[in-house]
């Protein structure tokens, strides 16, 4: 199972935006910890099972092959305040993080209507997962 935390494992256009995002957050006094970038299908299957067939809360709606992490186009982050992660989505820091990520050309899953994922940011290059599955490449 692979669940990378390295920005180097993202496709170049996503990596560039992710690096700019982390740097822009730092410039505004927000330290971000990258918790996930590339995730293989086995890791995605384990996450998808969580809250369904294994203990825990549901944390994703994406089955293996249907996550932008599987395509090296997404990252999950959390802010560190005094060295501790801020997971509560009620904390106003998440809105700041979301705005910074969007200003760097990333889509923020905190804006999604049906299943908000505050730590999740992605770069799609205007493509869909179906297009990637058919061989399209992110530019």
Which residues does each predicted region cover?
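Short Pro/Gly-enriched beta-strand edge/turn motifs at strand-loop
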Residues: 55-61
């Amino acid at each position: 199972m692979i669940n990378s935390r390295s920005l180097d494992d993202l496709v170049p256009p996503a990596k560039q935006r992710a690096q700019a995002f982390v740097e822009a957050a730092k410039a505004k006094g927000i330290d971000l910890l990258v918790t996930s970038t590339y995730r293989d299908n086995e890791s995605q299957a384990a996450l998808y099972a969580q809250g369904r067939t294994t203990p825990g809360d549901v944390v994703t709606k994406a089955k293996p092959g249907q996550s932008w992490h599987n395509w090296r186009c997404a990252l999950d982050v959390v802010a560190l305040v005094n060295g501790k992660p801020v997971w509560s989505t009620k904390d106003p820091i998440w809105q700041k993080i979301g705005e910074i990520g969007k200003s760097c050309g990333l889509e923020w899953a905190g804006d999604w209507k049906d299943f908000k994922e505050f730590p999740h940011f992605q770069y799609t290059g205007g493509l869909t997962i179906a297009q990637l599955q058919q061989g399209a490449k992110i530019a």
